[in-house]
Protein backbone atom coordinates (compact mmCIF):
# COMPACT_ATOMS: atom_id res chain seq x y z
CA UNK A 1 0.00 0.00 0.00
CA UNK A 2 1.37 3.37 -1.07
CA UNK A 3 1.42 6.16 1.44
CA UNK A 4 -0.19 9.56 0.81
CA UNK A 5 2.24 12.43 0.74
CA UNK A 6 0.37 14.74 3.08
CA UNK A 7 2.45 17.85 2.62
CA UNK A 8 1.79 17.92 -1.13
CA UNK A 9 -1.95 17.32 -0.67
CA UNK A 10 -2.19 20.05 1.90
CA UNK A 11 -0.27 22.38 -0.40
CA UNK A 12 -2.67 21.73 -3.28
CA UNK A 13 -5.73 22.15 -1.06
CA UNK A 14 -4.38 25.37 0.37
CA UNK A 15 -3.72 26.71 -3.10
CA UNK A 16 -7.25 25.93 -4.24
CA UNK A 17 -8.67 27.57 -1.13
CA UNK A 18 -6.59 30.69 -1.76
CA UNK A 19 -7.77 30.87 -5.38
CA UNK A 20 -11.39 30.43 -4.30
CA UNK A 21 -11.01 33.17 -1.71
CA UNK A 22 -9.52 35.57 -4.25
CA UNK A 23 -12.29 34.80 -6.76
CA UNK A 24 -14.95 35.28 -4.10
CA UNK A 25 -13.47 38.59 -3.02
CA UNK A 26 -13.20 39.72 -6.63
CA UNK A 27 -16.85 38.82 -7.23
CA UNK A 28 -17.86 40.78 -4.15
CA UNK A 29 -15.93 43.85 -5.29
CA UNK A 30 -17.29 43.52 -8.84
CA UNK A 31 -20.84 43.25 -7.52
CA UNK A 32 -20.47 46.26 -5.24
CA UNK A 33 -18.97 48.41 -7.99
CA UNK A 34 -20.99 46.96 -10.87
CA UNK A 35 -22.56 50.30 -11.91
CA UNK A 36 -19.16 52.03 -11.93
CA UNK A 37 -17.42 49.19 -13.81
CA UNK A 38 -20.22 48.90 -16.38
CA UNK A 39 -20.26 52.65 -16.96
CA UNK A 40 -16.46 52.64 -17.41
CA UNK A 41 -16.53 49.78 -19.94
CA UNK A 42 -19.62 50.58 -22.03
CA UNK A 43 -20.93 53.94 -20.76
CA UNK A 44 -24.44 54.60 -19.46
CA UNK A 45 -26.06 55.64 -22.73
CA UNK A 46 -27.04 59.02 -21.33
CA UNK A 47 -26.13 62.48 -22.51
CA UNK A 48 -23.73 64.30 -20.24
CA UNK A 49 -26.21 67.17 -20.32
CA UNK A 50 -29.16 64.98 -19.33
CA UNK A 51 -29.64 66.50 -15.87
CA UNK A 52 -29.31 70.08 -17.12
CA UNK A 53 -31.78 69.45 -19.95
CA UNK A 54 -34.26 67.81 -17.60
CA UNK A 55 -34.05 70.65 -15.09
CA UNK A 56 -34.49 73.25 -17.83
CA UNK A 57 -37.59 71.49 -19.16
CA UNK A 58 -38.97 71.20 -15.65
CA UNK A 59 -38.44 74.91 -15.09
CA UNK A 60 -40.20 75.77 -18.34
CA UNK A 61 -43.13 73.55 -17.37
CA UNK A 62 -43.36 75.15 -13.93
CA UNK A 63 -43.39 78.64 -15.43
CA UNK A 64 -46.04 77.64 -17.96
CA UNK A 65 -48.26 76.17 -15.24
CA UNK A 66 -48.05 79.42 -13.28
CA UNK A 67 -48.73 81.53 -16.37
CA UNK A 68 -51.99 79.64 -16.77
CA UNK A 69 -52.76 79.21 -13.08
CA UNK A 70 -52.16 82.62 -11.50
CA UNK A 71 -55.52 84.31 -10.83
CA UNK A 72 -56.09 87.96 -11.67
CA UNK A 73 -58.43 89.06 -8.87
CA UNK A 74 -58.67 92.76 -9.62
CA UNK A 75 -57.69 95.03 -12.51
CA UNK A 76 -59.22 98.49 -12.13
CA UNK A 77 -58.91 100.76 -15.17
CA UNK A 78 -56.94 98.01 -16.94
CA UNK A 79 -53.91 98.91 -14.84
CA UNK A 80 -52.30 95.66 -15.92
CA UNK A 81 -50.49 94.99 -18.10
CA UNK A 82 -48.25 97.96 -17.44
CA UNK A 83 -45.83 99.55 -19.89
CA UNK A 84 -43.73 100.90 -17.03
CA UNK A 85 -41.16 98.21 -16.22
CA UNK A 86 -39.63 100.02 -13.24
CA UNK A 87 -41.01 98.57 -10.01
CA UNK A 88 -40.71 98.99 -6.24
CA UNK A 89 -41.28 95.72 -4.36
CA UNK A 90 -42.59 96.14 -0.81
CA UNK A 91 -43.21 93.38 1.73
CA UNK A 92 -40.70 90.92 3.14
CA UNK A 93 -42.46 88.15 1.20
CA UNK A 94 -41.11 89.60 -2.04
CA UNK A 95 -37.48 89.50 -0.92
CA UNK A 96 -34.94 86.80 -1.72
CA UNK A 97 -35.18 85.47 1.85
CA UNK A 98 -38.94 85.80 2.09
CA UNK A 99 -40.33 84.44 -1.19
CA UNK A 100 -42.04 81.05 -0.80
CA UNK A 101 -41.42 78.39 -3.46
CA UNK A 102 -43.26 75.41 -1.97
CA UNK A 103 -45.20 74.19 1.02
CA UNK A 104 -44.17 71.46 3.44
CA UNK A 105 -44.79 67.72 3.34
CA UNK A 106 -45.36 66.04 -0.03
CA UNK A 107 -45.27 69.43 -1.75
CA UNK A 108 -41.65 69.99 -0.80
CA UNK A 109 -38.79 69.61 -3.28
CA UNK A 110 -35.20 70.41 -4.08
CA UNK A 111 -33.94 73.94 -3.56
CA UNK A 112 -31.62 73.68 -6.57
CA UNK A 113 -32.15 76.29 -9.26
CA UNK A 114 -34.62 78.45 -7.38
CA UNK A 115 -35.55 81.77 -9.03
CA UNK A 116 -36.44 84.52 -6.57
CA UNK A 117 -39.09 87.08 -7.43
CA UNK A 118 -36.54 89.89 -7.79
CA UNK A 119 -34.38 87.79 -10.12
CA UNK A 120 -37.45 86.88 -12.17
CA UNK A 121 -38.23 90.55 -12.77
CA UNK A 122 -34.62 91.30 -13.68
CA UNK A 123 -34.30 88.31 -16.01
CA UNK A 124 -37.35 89.50 -17.96
CA UNK A 125 -36.00 93.00 -18.44
CA UNK A 126 -37.60 94.86 -15.55
CA UNK A 127 -35.67 97.32 -13.40
CA UNK A 128 -36.30 96.84 -9.70
CA UNK A 129 -35.50 99.28 -6.91
CA UNK A 130 -32.27 97.57 -5.85
CA UNK A 131 -31.75 99.77 -2.80
CA UNK A 132 -35.14 98.70 -1.48
CA UNK A 133 -34.50 95.06 -2.38
CA UNK A 134 -31.12 95.09 -0.63
CA UNK A 135 -32.68 96.60 2.49
CA UNK A 136 -35.20 93.76 2.68
CA UNK A 137 -32.52 91.13 1.98
CA UNK A 138 -30.36 92.42 4.83
CA UNK A 139 -33.10 93.15 7.38
CA UNK A 140 -32.24 90.06 9.43
CA UNK A 141 -35.38 88.05 8.67
CA UNK A 142 -35.62 84.74 6.80
CA UNK A 143 -38.35 82.30 5.82
CA UNK A 144 -35.68 79.64 5.23
CA UNK A 145 -36.27 77.82 8.51
CA UNK A 146 -36.45 74.04 9.14
CA UNK A 147 -39.96 72.58 9.18
CA UNK A 148 -40.76 71.44 12.72
CA UNK A 149 -43.75 70.47 14.83
CA UNK A 150 -43.69 73.98 16.26
CA UNK A 151 -46.34 76.21 14.71
CA UNK A 152 -44.64 79.26 16.18
CA UNK A 153 -41.78 78.54 13.76
CA UNK A 154 -43.61 77.10 10.75
CA UNK A 155 -46.30 79.77 10.66
CA UNK A 156 -44.46 82.81 11.92
CA UNK A 157 -45.41 85.98 10.04
CA UNK A 158 -42.16 87.80 9.33
CA UNK A 159 -42.29 91.46 8.32
CA UNK A 160 -40.44 94.72 8.87
CA UNK A 161 -41.72 97.49 11.12
CA UNK A 162 -43.45 100.61 9.87
CA UNK A 163 -40.37 102.82 10.16
CA UNK A 164 -38.52 100.52 7.75
CA UNK A 165 -41.21 101.26 5.15
CA UNK A 166 -41.87 104.95 5.73
CA UNK A 167 -38.17 105.86 5.77
CA UNK A 168 -37.84 104.53 2.22
CA UNK A 169 -41.04 105.82 0.62
CA UNK A 170 -39.66 109.08 -0.78
CA UNK A 171 -36.70 107.40 -2.47
CA UNK A 172 -38.99 104.69 -3.80
CA UNK A 173 -41.41 107.24 -5.25
CA UNK A 174 -38.49 108.97 -7.00
CA UNK A 175 -37.50 105.65 -8.54
CA UNK A 176 -40.95 104.71 -9.87
CA UNK A 177 -44.55 105.79 -9.48
CA UNK A 178 -45.78 102.22 -9.03
CA UNK A 179 -45.33 99.64 -6.28
CA UNK A 180 -45.90 95.92 -5.85
CA UNK A 181 -46.86 94.68 -2.37
CA UNK A 182 -46.19 90.99 -1.69
CA UNK A 183 -48.11 89.15 1.03
CA UNK A 184 -46.90 85.63 1.82
CA UNK A 185 -48.26 82.74 3.88
CA UNK A 186 -46.92 79.22 4.37
CA UNK A 187 -48.84 75.93 4.52
CA UNK A 188 -48.71 72.19 4.05
CA UNK A 189 -49.94 68.82 5.17
CA UNK A 190 -50.00 67.60 8.75
CA UNK A 191 -50.73 70.96 10.38
CA UNK A 192 -53.80 73.15 10.60
CA UNK A 193 -53.20 76.88 10.35
CA UNK A 194 -53.26 78.72 13.69
CA UNK A 195 -56.15 80.90 14.76
CA UNK A 196 -53.74 83.50 16.06
CA UNK A 197 -50.61 85.12 14.70
CA UNK A 198 -47.06 84.31 15.69
CA UNK A 199 -45.04 87.30 14.48
CA UNK A 200 -41.44 88.35 14.00
CA UNK A 201 -41.42 92.07 13.25
CA UNK A 202 -37.88 93.28 12.55
CA UNK A 203 -36.58 90.79 15.11
CA UNK A 204 -39.24 91.36 17.78
CA UNK A 205 -41.25 88.17 18.40
CA UNK A 206 -44.84 88.40 19.64
CA UNK A 207 -48.25 86.72 19.48
CA UNK A 208 -51.47 88.41 18.38
CA UNK A 209 -54.43 86.38 19.66
CA UNK A 210 -56.98 88.72 18.03
CA UNK A 211 -56.17 87.75 14.43
CA UNK A 212 -55.88 84.44 12.61
CA UNK A 213 -53.03 83.42 10.33
CA UNK A 214 -54.83 84.12 7.05
CA UNK A 215 -55.61 87.77 7.62
CA UNK A 216 -53.26 90.73 7.48
CA UNK A 217 -51.18 91.42 10.55
CA UNK A 218 -51.23 94.89 12.10
CA UNK A 219 -47.81 95.58 10.58
CA UNK A 220 -48.91 94.44 7.13
CA UNK A 221 -51.93 96.72 7.36
CA UNK A 222 -49.65 99.62 8.26
CA UNK A 223 -47.37 98.85 5.33
CA UNK A 224 -50.29 98.64 2.89
CA UNK A 225 -51.72 101.94 4.10
CA UNK A 226 -48.36 103.73 3.93
CA UNK A 227 -47.62 102.49 0.41
CA UNK A 228 -51.14 103.23 -0.83
CA UNK A 229 -51.00 106.77 0.54
CA UNK A 230 -47.72 107.37 -1.32
CA UNK A 231 -48.35 105.71 -4.68
CA UNK A 232 -51.31 106.12 -7.00
CA UNK A 233 -50.75 102.78 -8.69
CA UNK A 234 -50.30 99.79 -6.37
CA UNK A 235 -50.44 96.09 -7.20
CA UNK A 236 -50.82 93.29 -4.64
CA UNK A 237 -49.42 89.79 -5.09
CA UNK A 238 -50.52 86.99 -2.76
CA UNK A 239 -47.79 84.33 -2.55
CA UNK A 240 -49.78 81.95 -0.34
CA UNK A 241 -50.45 78.24 0.08
CA UNK A 242 -54.02 79.05 1.12
CA UNK A 243 -56.44 81.85 0.35
CA UNK A 244 -56.53 84.89 2.63
CA UNK A 245 -59.03 87.48 3.72
CA UNK A 246 -58.67 90.16 1.04
CA UNK A 247 -61.24 92.80 1.91
CA UNK A 248 -58.52 95.45 2.12
CA UNK A 249 -58.22 95.33 -1.69
CA UNK A 250 -61.45 97.34 -1.81
CA UNK A 251 -60.44 99.82 0.89
CA UNK A 252 -57.70 101.68 -0.99
CA UNK A 253 -58.45 103.25 -4.42
CA UNK A 254 -54.74 103.18 -5.26
CA UNK A 255 -54.76 99.35 -5.27
CA UNK A 256 -55.41 98.90 -8.97
CA UNK A 257 -54.70 95.20 -9.44
CA UNK A 258 -54.23 92.01 -7.44
CA UNK A 259 -52.86 88.57 -8.31
CA UNK A 260 -53.22 85.31 -6.39
CA UNK A 261 -50.28 82.93 -6.78
CA UNK A 262 -50.00 79.81 -4.60
CA UNK A 263 -46.57 78.20 -4.33
CA UNK A 264 -45.06 78.22 -7.83
CA UNK A 265 -42.08 75.91 -7.47
CA UNK A 266 -38.51 76.84 -8.29
CA UNK A 267 -39.22 78.77 -11.51
CA UNK A 268 -42.87 79.80 -11.18
CA UNK A 269 -41.80 83.32 -10.23
CA UNK A 270 -41.00 83.98 -13.90
CA UNK A 271 -44.74 84.09 -14.59
CA UNK A 272 -45.26 87.21 -12.46
CA UNK A 273 -43.26 89.76 -14.52
CA UNK A 274 -44.52 88.15 -17.72
CA UNK A 275 -48.15 88.61 -16.67
CA UNK A 276 -47.65 92.12 -15.28
CA UNK A 277 -45.75 93.16 -18.40
CA UNK A 278 -48.33 91.76 -20.80
CA UNK A 279 -46.20 88.99 -22.28
CA UNK A 280 -48.92 86.51 -21.33
CA UNK A 281 -52.55 86.95 -20.30
CA UNK A 282 -53.61 85.45 -16.96
CA UNK A 283 -56.27 82.76 -17.27
CA UNK A 284 -56.33 81.08 -13.85
CA UNK A 285 -59.57 80.50 -11.95
CA UNK A 286 -60.06 80.13 -8.21
CA UNK A 287 -60.32 76.60 -6.89
CA UNK A 288 -61.78 77.94 -3.65
CA UNK A 289 -64.20 80.56 -2.37
CA UNK A 290 -62.70 83.68 -0.81
CA UNK A 291 -64.95 85.13 1.88
CA UNK A 292 -64.56 88.54 3.48
CA UNK A 293 -64.57 86.90 6.90
CA UNK A 294 -63.36 83.31 7.27
CA UNK A 295 -65.30 82.88 10.50
CA UNK A 296 -68.46 82.81 8.36
CA UNK A 297 -67.62 79.20 7.45
CA UNK A 298 -68.65 76.35 9.79
CA UNK A 299 -65.28 74.67 9.22
CA UNK A 300 -63.62 77.55 11.08
CA UNK A 301 -65.15 76.35 14.35
CA UNK A 302 -63.08 73.17 14.40
CA UNK A 303 -59.98 74.09 12.45
CA UNK A 304 -56.58 74.44 14.09
CA UNK A 305 -55.35 73.29 17.47
CA UNK A 306 -56.62 75.62 20.16
CA UNK A 307 -53.75 74.79 22.51
CA UNK A 308 -50.31 74.35 21.02
CA UNK A 309 -49.06 73.03 24.37
CA UNK A 310 -51.40 70.13 23.74
CA UNK A 311 -50.37 70.06 20.10
CA UNK A 312 -46.72 69.57 21.00
CA UNK A 313 -47.32 66.91 23.67
CA UNK A 314 -49.87 64.84 21.75
CA UNK A 315 -49.07 61.97 19.40
CA UNK A 316 -49.75 61.43 15.73
CA UNK A 317 -50.78 57.82 16.42
CA UNK A 318 -51.28 56.25 19.82
CA UNK A 319 -53.29 53.49 21.47
CA UNK A 320 -52.00 54.23 24.95
CA UNK A 321 -54.56 55.26 27.52
CA UNK A 322 -54.17 58.84 28.66
CA UNK A 323 -52.20 60.08 25.64
CA UNK A 324 -53.55 62.85 23.45
CA UNK A 325 -53.99 62.04 19.77
CA UNK A 326 -53.85 64.80 17.17
CA UNK A 327 -57.15 65.11 15.39
CA UNK A 328 -59.65 67.54 13.90
CA UNK A 329 -63.38 66.97 14.14
CA UNK A 330 -65.03 67.45 10.72
CA UNK A 331 -68.54 68.33 11.90
CA UNK A 332 -69.13 70.51 8.83
CA UNK A 333 -69.38 67.37 6.64
CA UNK A 334 -69.26 68.38 2.93
CA UNK A 335 -70.08 72.01 3.65
CA UNK A 336 -66.76 73.66 2.98
CA UNK A 337 -65.87 76.15 0.27
CA UNK A 338 -68.56 76.73 -2.30
CA UNK A 339 -70.60 73.77 -0.99
CA UNK A 340 -71.23 75.87 2.10
CA UNK A 341 -71.51 79.37 0.68
CA UNK A 342 -73.72 78.49 -2.30
CA UNK A 343 -76.00 76.22 -0.25
CA UNK A 344 -76.32 78.78 2.54
CA UNK A 345 -77.22 81.44 -0.01
CA UNK A 346 -79.86 79.20 -1.56
CA UNK A 347 -81.37 78.65 1.88
CA UNK A 348 -81.45 82.41 2.57
CA UNK A 349 -78.86 82.19 5.31
CA UNK A 350 -77.22 85.46 4.27
CA UNK A 351 -80.42 87.49 3.84
CA UNK A 352 -80.02 89.31 7.14
CA UNK A 353 -76.30 89.91 6.52
CA UNK A 354 -76.62 91.90 3.30
CA UNK A 355 -76.83 88.93 0.96
CA UNK A 356 -74.28 86.69 -0.73
CA UNK A 357 -72.19 89.55 -2.15
CA UNK A 358 -71.62 90.91 1.36
CA UNK A 359 -70.22 87.56 2.50
CA UNK A 360 -68.28 86.28 -0.53
CA UNK A 361 -65.68 88.53 -2.12
CA UNK A 362 -64.48 86.16 -4.86
CA UNK A 363 -66.57 83.05 -5.66
CA UNK A 364 -65.35 79.64 -6.74
CA UNK A 365 -64.16 79.72 -10.36
CA UNK A 366 -63.54 83.47 -10.39
CA UNK A 367 -60.69 84.91 -12.42
CA UNK A 368 -60.19 87.87 -14.75
CA UNK A 369 -58.23 88.13 -17.99
CA UNK A 370 -56.71 90.79 -20.20
CA UNK A 371 -58.95 89.57 -23.01
CA UNK A 372 -62.59 90.55 -23.44
CA UNK A 373 -65.27 88.07 -24.45
CA UNK A 374 -68.72 88.21 -26.01
CA UNK A 375 -71.37 85.57 -25.44
CA UNK A 376 -73.55 84.63 -28.37
CA UNK A 377 -75.87 81.65 -28.84
CA UNK A 378 -75.55 80.66 -32.48
CA UNK A 379 -78.25 77.99 -32.49
CA UNK A 380 -80.51 75.96 -30.24
CA UNK A 381 -81.90 72.51 -30.82
CA UNK A 382 -84.99 71.35 -28.89
CA UNK A 383 -85.72 67.65 -28.56
CA UNK A 384 -89.37 66.96 -27.73
CA UNK A 385 -90.25 63.65 -26.13
CA UNK A 386 -93.81 63.44 -24.86
CA UNK A 387 -95.31 66.39 -23.05
CA UNK A 388 -92.03 68.00 -21.98
CA UNK A 389 -89.09 69.60 -23.78
CA UNK A 390 -85.53 68.69 -22.79
Regions found by a protein language model. Give the residues of each.
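C-terminal non-catalytic regions of proteins with extracellular/luminal or membrane-system context
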Residues: 1-390
